[in-house]
């Protein structure tokens, strides 16, 4: 007699649902409300920064954590920096203008049709 083994209930933590990433590495995007733009160089499927960072955002503007978050080589009229931005706060930048961040040359090739190509040595 072949009895099927019973599977015990899983004790693994349940991962949050993962939303579809709207943007890709190399895309040029801009913030919906703030005056900056940048190139995506990494994507987190859900929020993966510190709770301290999250709580520093004014409550009325805090994005949901259950969405993709993007790491940007960002710029505004005054400086270049790295930004961490939720998907809901980004839109494609259609200006066709290059982003003038000093780290771009180390990660990406030329700008082509609104996106930067990742250099061969950085592709997985």
Describe these PLM feature segments.
Residues 41-42, 51:
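Short, glycine/acidic-enriched capping/hinge loops at junctions between secondary-structure elements
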Residues 57-63:
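Short proline/glycine-enriched turn/loop segments at secondary-structure junctions
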């Amino acid at each position: 007699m072949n009895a099927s083994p019973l599977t015990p209930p899983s004790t693994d933590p349940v991962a949050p649902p993962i939303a579809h990433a709207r943007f890709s590495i190399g895309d040029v995007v801009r913030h919906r409300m703030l005056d900056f733009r940048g190139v995506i160089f990494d994507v987190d499927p859900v929020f993966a920064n510190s709770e301290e960072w999250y709580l520093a955002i004014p409550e009325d503007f805090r994005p949901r954590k259950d969405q993709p978050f993007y790491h940007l080589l960002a710029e505004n009229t005054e400086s270049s920096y790295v930004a961490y931005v939720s998907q809901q706060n980004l839109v494609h930048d259609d200006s066709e203008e290059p982003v003038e961040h000093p780290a771009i040359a180390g990660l990406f090739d030329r700008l082509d049709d609104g996106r930067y190509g990742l250099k061969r040595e950085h592709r997985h």
